[in-house]
């Protein structure tokens, strides 16, 4: 069976793209009455310019049972060669984590999920145990409040986010772990990439949150010019509030893909 890592690399190479479209489906903002049709058109318009999609579970959960049904349909409408990352930031004790892993990997069939490591290794192990799936561990997140805990200096003399990165390296026996690091903290991203040279890094925070694309690509990419997954949600989904929303999303995704590739080229990385 193809692994998440293999699927991600193939999609990125085929589409020459490090773009991940975040599906943060806010029903108060979508320019059509049917969320399913909105998702269908967004995915159809952008799929040739992305390496992955990332549904934000909270935006589906707030719709209740209809939202869960919608999420299931959205996952299935993504082209099978493009990986889907479930963004739930899950974290709980081992038995509960096992239930989450079964729900997200077996029932909903996500290719990867985001994980909150605050409760330690036993809360992460049930996800690692699926070697064909991927997990992205929250490391240094893009929100301003991340400084409250993630920057605290531990007994090792290192900030907590670096301890998380190093633990992720230790746990990565199945080569299926990645990290979440915000573009809003470029120096921290650079430090984490140096410590974890081969891990994929999911990078939110571009655009609306103020992250700089050049630094995200330059500091987040691995030695081959890959490894960075640049997430964009609102800037693509809501590029237009009119009936041309799908066409506008397509152009926004294409533009971001091309901007990223320009930065890669400037740093002597190419897709060939």
Predicted regions and their residues:
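Conserved N-terminal beta1-alpha1 strand-loop-helix module at the mouth
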Residues: 1-81, 156, 244-261, 265
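Acidic (Asp/Glu)-rich catalytic clusters
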Residues: 12-14, 43-49, 73-80, 126-131, ...
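Short, well-ordered coil/turn segments that N-cap beta-strands
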Residues: 15-19, 49-51, 80-82, 111, ...
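Conserved, mostly hydrophobic/aromatic
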Residues: 21, 53, 87, 113, ...
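Conserved anion-binding
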Residues: 26-27, 92-180, 198
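Active-site-adjacent beta->alpha loops and helix N-cap segments on the catalytic face
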Residues: 62-77, 93-97, 117-132, 184-194, ...
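A C-terminal functional module that forms or caps the active site or interfaces directly
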Residues: 183-231, 235-236
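C-terminal helical cap(s) of enzyme catalytic domains, especially alpha/beta-barrels
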Residues: 215-227, 238-271
């Amino acid at each position: 069976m193809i692994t998440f890592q293999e699927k991600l690399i193939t999609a990125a190479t085929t589409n020459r793209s490090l773009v991940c479209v975040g599906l943060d489906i806010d029903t108060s903002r979508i320019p059509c009455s049917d969320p399913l049709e909105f998702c269908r058109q967004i995915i159809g318009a952008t799929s040739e310019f992305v390496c992955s999609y990332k549904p934000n579970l909270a935006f589906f959960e707030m719709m209740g049972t209809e939202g869960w049904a919608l999420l299931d349909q959205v996952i299935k409408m993504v082209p099978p060669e493009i990986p889907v990352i479930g963004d739930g930031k899950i974290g709980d004790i081992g038995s509960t984590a096992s239930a989450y892993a079964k729900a997200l990997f077996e029932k909903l069939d996500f290719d990867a999920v985001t994980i909150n490591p605050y409760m330690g290794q036993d809360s992460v192990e049930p996800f690692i145990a699926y070697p064909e799936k991927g997990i992205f561990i929250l490391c240094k997140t893009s929100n301003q409040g991340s400084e409250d805990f993630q920057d605290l200096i531990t007994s090792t003399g290192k900030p907590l986010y670096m301890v998380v990165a190093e633990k992720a390296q230790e746990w990565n026996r199945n080569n299926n772990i990645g990290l979440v690091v915000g573009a809003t903290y470029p120096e921290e991203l650079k430090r984490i990439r140096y410590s974890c040279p081969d891990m994929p890094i999911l990078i939110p925070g571009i655009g609306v949150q103020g992250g700089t694309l050049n630094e995200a690509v330059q500091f987040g990419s691995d030695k081959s010019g890959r490894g960075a997954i640049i997430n964009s949600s609102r800037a693509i989904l809501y590029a237009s509030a009119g009936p041309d929303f799908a066409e506008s999303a397509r152009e926004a995704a294409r533009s971001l893909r091309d901007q990223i590739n320009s930065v890669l080229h400037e740093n002597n990385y190419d897709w060939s």
